[in-house]
């Protein structure tokens, strides 16, 4: 992995984790699509418009746009067309809009995918891209750069090992805050329900809550 590639993943990873907890898009898929669609953030669209995902502009969307040539695979051949693409104020705005796009009912199977391979296939099947090799290209990026490990991080934080030690009256609340990423278990996957919370830990919890609200 080059330094530029490492920096790009580090740039995308925090927001990718955040949108998983809020919108259920696997972080590996988010990062892999950003890599493919923006060529590691070096595409003209990424540089001029902060658009990492090749999301097109539509009338009434409330965004500015840039016009760029793009290739579409139609009737078994590649053709070049001029298209309008959304222009964002920041990279994070682009990531959030991508997550919102995947809330469309046609992407329901992407959000319910059990792993990155299924998610990669379903996002293509739902019409995100016309390239028939798109799923494999996503999977190759995820496996080459071990992006699935980020999925494992967020999923392990949800499956806490000592959930049976949580009082019945608190189980729903604990499940909700862990699922949303507001509170997580320790490195071994234990929630430690009876352990006291320090002021600095409380600050982290409140910060995560504020991020979800924002």
Annotate the PLM regions.
Residues 155-214:
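Short, solvent-exposed alpha-helical surface patches in non-cytosolic proteins
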Residues 1-155:
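Catalytic cores of secreted/periplasmic lytic hydrolases that degrade extracellular macromolecules
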């Amino acid at each position: 992995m080059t330094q530029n590639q490492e920096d790009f993943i580090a740039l995308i990873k925090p927001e990718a984790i955040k949108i998983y907890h809020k919108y259920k898009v696997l972080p590996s898929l988010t990062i892999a699509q950003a890599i493919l669609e923006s060529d590691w953030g070096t595409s003209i669209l990424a540089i001029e418009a902060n658009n990492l995902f090749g999301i097109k502009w539509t009338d009434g969307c409330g965004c500015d746009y840039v016009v760029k040539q793009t290739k579409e695979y139609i009737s078994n051949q590649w053709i070049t067309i001029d298209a309008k693409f959304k222009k964002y104020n920041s990279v994070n705005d682009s990531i959030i809009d991508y997550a919102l796009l995947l809330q469309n009912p046609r992407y329901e199977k992407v959000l319910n995918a059990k792993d990155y391979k299924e998610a990669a296939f379903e996002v293509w099947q739902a019409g995100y891209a016309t390239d028939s090799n798109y799923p494999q290209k996503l999977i190759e990026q995820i496996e080459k750069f071990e992006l699935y490990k980020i999925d494992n991080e967020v999923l392990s934080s949800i499956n806490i090992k000592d959930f049976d030690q949580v009082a019945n009256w608190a189980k729903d609340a604990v499940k909700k805050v862990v699922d949303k990423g507001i509170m997580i278990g320790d490195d071994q996957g234990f929630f430690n329900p009876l352990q006291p919370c320090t002021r600095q830990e409380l600050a982290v919890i409140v910060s995560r809550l504020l991020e979800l609200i924002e």
